[in-house]
Amino acid sequence: SGFERVFVGEESRGSITGLHNWVQFYLEETKGNVNYLGWTGRQDRHADDDVHVVTVKFSWADDDPELEVKPMSTMLCGSTVEFEFAALTLAFLAGDQNGDTKLALGDEQLRIVCHAMRSKFGAHVGSAYFELA
């Protein structure tokens, strides 16, 4: 489901999908399942800026003995799961279901990127995540 992909992370067709939640990322790392390989931020920022959206690179063991590398996953750090769930759902329902919605969060200009999953019951969240605009 979209919720699992975004907030828990999944393995699909031999690659890591989702895992866009900083709390789950932290929990997986403390269990030894995630190996953090670095992060990137906007190049126009100074090191002392308060960055809330980060793009991380990591490997994830999960149940597979072979570690897979996810080259990029963006996360909104420091937020609650409830806030992220509400913002991502609202962007999907009120915005473009296969595109992005702009969001101002404090001084940050963000984009919420949504990807729809279609079934005979209609469109559902396939994936959604935050990016710096």
What does each model-found stretch correspond to?
Residues 1-104:
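N-terminal "domain-start" segment
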Residues 82-133:
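Compact beta-sheet-dominated globular domain cores
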